[in-house]
Amino acid sequence: MKACHVATERGIVLDGVLFQSGQQTDTIVIAITGIHGNFYSNPFYYNIGYTLNRSGIDFLYAQTNDAFDRMQTDNVVTGRKEWIGSWNERFAYTDEDIGAYIGYAEKAGYSHIILAGHSLGANKVIYYLAHNHDPRIAHFLLLSPADLDYMMSGVSGQEKRLIRRQVEQGYGNEMLPFPFMGWVSCIAYTAWDWLFSGLLNNVFTETDADFTQCSNITHTGALLIGTYDTFTDGDPTGFLQNINDHMPTACTEQAGLHRRDRT
């Protein structure tokens, strides 16, 4: 297990952790984290890494901009220190954040890359695959993607109006006067992305929702969710089945829908 540091196109350095099997392997699983899904808050990633290692597969725990609420990192373009986190993430960073980790794996010599994502990280993987038919990626793995419509249902109308007004008046980079969703301290632009951008709002409980991103994916892969998942409006299995139904590769032998009764 070793730390890895990956620079994005905008210069921000993201920190990940590489679990190496100790065997000669060309296969790696890159796991894109969800919000606050850092190496310290999710110890189950140790189990994933060590389990894959025992099968001769390397594992890269890939923290993105929102892995922590706030942390300091380097910007290799400006040469300065910067503060990043869930407090100022922009969803438009998704392509270059994921692309940086894929580039890291390719440069390290891996030719069989499985791109995984957990929670909001799964939504990011969907976004990336919908816009980048990247031949370096062999398959995808989506772990409990987040239903943003359900998550946003707890944001009051008054809070939505305040966020919209703050952005429209030119104060998007200012902190909100309240915790977004009740637990995220962030700037108005970040809350705007969650609520109004639609960039990562790509999975739904409704069968007739806009599944354009899912339908644009040409890779094959697998989906996994726990039946205790609380971000799916009460029906985790149906939620995952609905996503699978909108995947154009779902009928191929490589794709699959997997259910476990506990999480």
Question: How would you name each of these model-derived features?
Answer:
Residues 164-210:
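Mobile cap/lid helix-loop segments that gate and shape the active-site cleft of serine hydrolases
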Residues 76-108:
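Alpha/beta-hydrolase active-site loop
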Residues 217-218, 223-225:
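Short beta-strand/loop motif that positions the catalytic acidic residue
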Residues 103-168, 195-196:
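Primarily recognizes the serine-hydrolase "nucleophile elbow" in alpha/beta-hydrolase
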Residues 1-23:
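N-terminal cap/lid segment of alpha/beta-hydrolase-fold proteins
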